[in-house]
Amino acid sequence: MTRLKWGDTLRNPQLVEGDQLMRFNVVVANPPFSLDKWGADEAAKDPHGRFWRGIPPKSKGDYAFITHMIETTYVDPHENGRVGVIVPHGVLFRGGAEGRIRQQLIEENLLDAVVGLPANLFTTTGIPVAILIFDRSREQGGANADRRDVLFIDASK
């Protein structure tokens, strides 16, 4: 089933049942790149606990979207919760809070693949982008927890 809602995904998620975020088998998005003022001031009080890995910088909301997407996929190994997200290349390299969140995602063994795409792919920006694939079945206790590899694809040429 497909459910679409209009709203502010980070400040006021619309896909909820009761007081819980809805869970999905697959979540795919192309969120706004490096969104400024995404709601960092409110993240520490998030009623859904999405930012337990850390709060991304106020001026860069990329990891806020990534974290939200991961937290809305199934953890159950039989449900295969997967995430595909298009991000600016900076998401792969920036330090500080973003570096700590990225490290946590890697330590959780969630990152499955990184696909580097060329610059000028989008008409609205010339920066290179990447597709990140996360797989919840790789978590401890999951069906693919023994997989520790990450597939890197250079599709930038």
Give the residues covered by each predicted segment.
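Conserved SAM/SAH cofactor-binding pocket of Class I
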Residues: 1
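A conserved structural/catalytic subdomain of Rossmann-like adenosyl-cofactor enzymes
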Residues: 6, 11-13, 17-157
